[in-house]
């Protein structure tokens, strides 16, 4: 397996070098909106610990990510009046991973509404700000 690259985009977000639409943070994880969402409210949950993917993360660090994803899923149901939630996590190129810092996708779903294709469009910043505010309110 390739070594963790500290110059990946999510590591840069953690260091404050890239901006993000943050919805949740604690000592172990950061959750922020995907700027190319597959649906409104599409959130990424990442560990603060450097980890390329599930094959590279310490189990206790992955547990923090899973707990945060659970919290975001519940808030997403409320904030977006969702009918369900899709949670995805990809590992290595053959497994569909594109950004090589472990992350979980949490996507609120509505009956009969398909997800957009991955990375098909960049969302407007105002829409992302509004969706972040909805999620933050549901988390409080």
Where do the protein language model's features map onto the residues?
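HIT superfamily nucleotide-processing domains
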Residues: 1-140
